Amino acid sequence: MCSRDMDRGCAWESSEVGRLRGMSACAEPLSVAPAPEDGLALRFYEVTSADGTVLRAWTNDVEGPVLLLCNGLGTNPYAWPSLLDPDCGVRVVSWNHRGVGGSARPTDPDRVGQEEFVEDALAVLDDAGVVACAVAGWSIGVNTMFELAVTRPERVTGLFALAGVPGETFGSMGAPLFIPRFARKPIATAVARLLGLVGNPLHRVTSRLEIGPCAGRVVTHSGFMLPVTDEPLARLAIREFLTTPTDWYSHLALASSLHARVPLHSIDVPTTFVAGRYDVLAASHDMRTASERIPSAQYVELPGSHFLQMEKPREVHALLLELLDRVALRG
């Protein structure tokens, strides 16, 4: 698993965004990975979703079983250090959300709900020539993962839920802060709406923030996030996250807040839930009770926050590989 502590520049990132947006979906796959000395297995390319929205997809091009990753809302590959390790043993395919990280906004701005995210996931699978595979989800991506598993079960062979619940996500926020359950969704929704109201002025500030070593340590020792194993890569993940306009992020979040709890009785594939004990965005209790509704599902709780794959990459990756072994044994 990746635990390098070298600084990684991101100048290559901004220089390629314009070219990515101008390429057609059928163009030659783009080689825009960081320099080889950075040690990251990462390549971006374009995929067109069912409604014509052009997505910025990515893969690590690693030999191994295929894993579709439904990432956290508005996040990026750099939040997954273990999956960017050339020796991780897992071939990942994923994409950046609509209007995020080089993916276009849809013509209809309301097409940003979980149903559309499932369409995007299917487009990525189809483009990669993958008939069915295991699926991992993080945070809001757990909603997408379970929605895909329920609506298109023939495409899913296993499920790995990290720091997320299968729907009704806003109702799971704030548990470690002792916010009563009845108040969690109203408070989370109010915060998301406030971000939308102050979006443009706030984005002008956050998009100019220098996320250097000191700022990075403040974030990773804030309690919201706990200390990480790869600080340079975490800083890159934070910098990239802050490039998304705040009002658009609010729009995406509010759309996902409408996603109801997914019924789990039909899930019949190997499933693992990995929760963070101190996660303020996805209550570990809710993840545990969700796991109890799926026969033979495994539940693991780690001493970490919402960002377990950055704080405990070795442990999370080992659990992922164990899930993939169960999928392989099932055939």
Task: State where each predicted segment sits.
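Active-site loop/oxyanion-hole signature of alpha/beta-hydrolase fold enzymes
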Residues: 94-140, 144
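Flexible "cap/lid" loop of the alpha/beta hydrolase fold
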Residues: 157-202
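Short beta-strand/loop motif that positions the catalytic acidic residue
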Residues: 267, 273-275
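Conserved HGGG/HGGXW glycine-rich cap/lid loop of the alpha/beta-hydrolase fold
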Residues: 53-105, 124
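The conserved beta1-alpha1 loop
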Residues: 68-72, 138, 275
